């Protein structure tokens, strides 16, 4: 999901997606530890997506304080 697509969502929707991505990241790390993970690049993709969403949330917080 691109940053522009994330900006179209409400803050509550973004927070919900962050929560689900964190759960997915936990599961991916668990699979990695047990040797079941085939696509290791997915961990990086999920981490980057979480960072993008948190960045948009922070941008909104800063804009609201001005």
Curated annotation (Swiss-Prot):
Name assigned to this protein: Large ribosomal subunit protein uL29
Similarity section: Belongs to the universal ribosomal protein uL29 family.
A Gene Ontology cellular-component term: cytosolic large ribosomal subunit
Assigned keywords, A-Z: Ribonucleoprotein, Ribosomal protein
Pfam family, one: Ribosomal_L29
Matching Gene3D superfamilies: 1.10.287.310
Cited NCBIfam families: L29 (TIGR00012)
GO biological process: translation
Classification via InterPro entries: Ribosomal_protein_uL29, Ribosomal_uL29, Ribosomal_uL29_CS, Ribosomal_uL29_sf
Organism, scientific name: Bacillus subtilis (strain 168)
PANTHER family, alphabetized: 60S RIBOSOMAL PROTEIN L35/50S RIBOSOMAL PROTEIN L29, LARGE RIBOSOMAL SUBUNIT PROTEIN UL29C
Quaternary structure annotation from Swiss-Prot or TrEMBL: Part of the 50S ribosomal subunit.
Source species, domain of life: Bacteria
Single GO MF annotation: structural constituent of ribosome
Gene for this chain: rpmC
Matches recorded under HAMAP family: Ribosomal_uL29 (MF_00374)
Ribonucleoprotein as UniProt keyword: yes
Claim: Ribonucleoprotein is one of the keywords in the record: yes
């Amino acid at each position: 999901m691109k940053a522009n697509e994330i900006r179209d969502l409400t803050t509550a929707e973004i927070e919900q997606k962050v929560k689900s991505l964190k759960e997915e990241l936990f599961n991916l790390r668990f699979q990695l530890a047990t040797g079941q993970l085939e696509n290791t690049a997915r961990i990086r993709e999920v981490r980057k997506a979480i960072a993008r969403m948190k960045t948009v949330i922070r941008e909104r917080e800063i804009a609201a304080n001005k």
